[in-house]
Each structure stands twice: as structure tokens, then as C-alpha cells.
A protein has these predicted regions:
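Glycine-rich, small/polar surface segments that engage phosphate groups of diverse ligands
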Residues: 22-84
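Active-site-proximal loop/helix of nucleotide/amide-processing enzymes and allied scaffolds
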Residues: 1-15, 23, 32, 57, ...
Length: 159
């Protein structure tokens, strides 16, 4: 037994209690989410994907830039989407990403990724409230998967 000696390392994570960084407003619609996050997603030269971690009353706890891609795609690793939600003890999450052009049309990848995230959120009991695509510089328009593709949240269709 003395042949192997291991050093035990204790690691602890602590979230500091600070004032909200960007909003204390309740987010109940896709447009409200865009208003809150516009300054972080506007005028980007490539696609960004971010997650807003929400408390039980749909107030933002914090947000996390999950990935930065190129001009027409950003990879979205599932573990990165839920990591900050778990560490923040979030009750739910909201996913947003930008399209660098003016098109709000979701790609096949966007649809597939949304479905995977909704299913993963169900498994972890951290619901995905919506996945919102924004485009252009004013962000007066957005594409809400929850509003436009509600079947993605239907467990009977997508168990």
C-alpha cells in the first residue's frame, strides 16, 4: 500500500453574490430577451451563442457566451450550454444566438441543436425556455423557436 501515494485535493466553487450585471427585469418574451441582450450580440462580425441563466421567476441570474463561431455558424457544445446553469443553480435557461446577416431563418443545425438542448434540459430538470435568433443591428425583429416551432417542446412528438 505504501507503493502509491496520492495527494488529495479539495476543490470548491463559490458563486459570489453581486448585483446583476445587466438586468433585473423579468424576461417573459423573446423580444424582452433580445432587449436585455442586444448590446452583447449586436454588431458582431461572427456568430455568438449565449445562454441566459434564469431564476424560478424568470429573472436573469447571469449570462454566458457559450461559443463564438464564424460568419455563418457557431458550434454549440451541449456541456457548455448547461455548465453555467448548473453552477448558477438556474431554474431554467434561455439560448440566444445572432446571425451576422439580416436573415432570421434558422438553419437545419439551429433546429437540430434546439431540439437536443430541449431534450437535455428535460433530463437535467433545467428547462430551455426558448432559443432566440437575432439578426441585423437594431434587433427589432427576432425568431423565437418557442413561438415559431412550438412542437420542439412537445414530448409526445419528440420524447
Amino acid at each position: 500500500m505504501d507503493k502509491y501515494k496520492f495527494k488529495q485535493v479539495d476543490i470548491r466553487l463559490k458563486l459570489s453574490q453581486a448585483k446583476p450585471l445587466y438586468s433585473t427585469e423579468q424576461i417573459t418574451t423573446a423580444q424582452k430577451a433580445v432587449e436585455v441582450m442586444a448590446e452583447y450580440l449586436s454588431e458582431r462580425d461572427r456568430e455568438y451563442c449565449c445562454v441566459v441563466n434564469m431564476d424560478a421567476a424568470n429573472h436573469p441570474i447571469n449570462f454566458n457566451i457559450v461559443s463564438i463561431g464564424d460568419t455563418n455558424h457557431t458550434p454549440v457544445p451541449m456541456q457548455n450550454v448547461f455548465k453555467s446553469a448548473i453552477l448558477s443553480n438556474a431554474a431554467s435557461i434561455l439560448i440566444l444566438h445572432n446571425h451576422t446577416g439580416r436573415s432570421l431563418t434558422p438553419s437545419t443545425f439551429d433546429v437540430d441543436m434546439t431540439l437536443k438542448m430541449v431534450k437535455a434540459g428535460r433530463l437535467m430538470n433545467i428547462p430551455v425556455l426558448d432559443h432566440v435568433i437575432v439578426a441585423g443591428s437594431t434587433y427589432d425583429r427576432c425568431f423565437s423557436f418557442k413561438e415559431q416551432e412550438p412542437d420542439l417542446w412537445n414530448e409526445r412528438i419528440y420524447p
